[in-house]
Amino acid sequence: MDLSNLVTIVIPCKNENDIISKTLDLLNHQTGISGVKVIVCDSSDDGITKLTLWDRLEYNMDYFDLHIMDGGLPARARNNGFKLVTTPYVLFMDADIFLLDSDVLTNVVSKIKTEDLDLVSVRLRSDNGDYNYVYKVFDVLQRLSMLVSPFCLGGFMLTKTSKFKEIGGFDEEVKIAEDYAYSKQIKRDKFKVYNTFVYTPPRRFKDKGLWYMTKLMIGSLLNKNNKEYFKDGKDYWS
């Protein structure tokens, strides 16, 4: 499958030199990745990440078509990246999402097309096995939440471009869980989470602590209709 005419990938990034390098290296191994537009929306100020990204671009190191744009908080960064999207689907990925299975993209894009869905996601697991029990608990909570409305996290969000335009993109007033705020606007029968796995370093659990992350997730669920709750960044990005 030639993905270049089907999907564009948008990745917010800030001060994640080694991580974004690994993410992009793994993207090079995806089946059908040749020519796919990959837009990294970077707001790094560490003096290293920007150089790494521009070196990749200058020396044409990737099979995909790399673009670099200004970033910001995830909602703004993703909306910026979307300005270059011309394909029928767009994949919003976090900078620390590792696609270890080389057929993840072709499989998921094929399914969203065949099933005519507006938004799909996949299962998350840690790249070293730590905290996987937390991800499994989240899987259960996500299934329960989906009885009422879609619940999607922004680590891996593949959405129909026309639907993204219809919704108006990510709400830039929202500082946390902008991905969840977007997914709530999708009809239940147009959303699905596939039993395909992608991997991520459990750095937020290590940096913020399990209790903080648990409170944030439960708080998001309990305040799903309270936009003011999500306007406060709650020190997540500090």
Kindly give the residue locations of the regions a language model identified:
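Glycine-rich, basic loop-to-helix element that forms the pyrophosphate-binding segment
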Residues: M69-V85
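Conserved donor NDP-sugar-binding/catalytic core segment of glycosyltransferases
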Residues: S102-Y131
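Short beta-strand/loop segment that forms part of the nucleotide-sugar
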Residues: G35-D45, H67-G71
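Acidic donor-binding loop at a coil-to-helix junction in glycosyltransferase catalytic cores
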Residues: I176-Y182
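A recurrent flexible, glycine/aromatic-enriched loop bordering the glycosyltransferase active site
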Residues: L124-G129, L141-T159
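A conserved acidic beta->alpha catalytic loop
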Residues: L26, C41-L53, I97-F98
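Short, well-formed alpha-helical segments that are part of the catalytic scaffolds
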Residues: E16-H29
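Short aromatic/hydrophobic "clamp" motif used to bind/position activated sugar donors
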Residues: V90
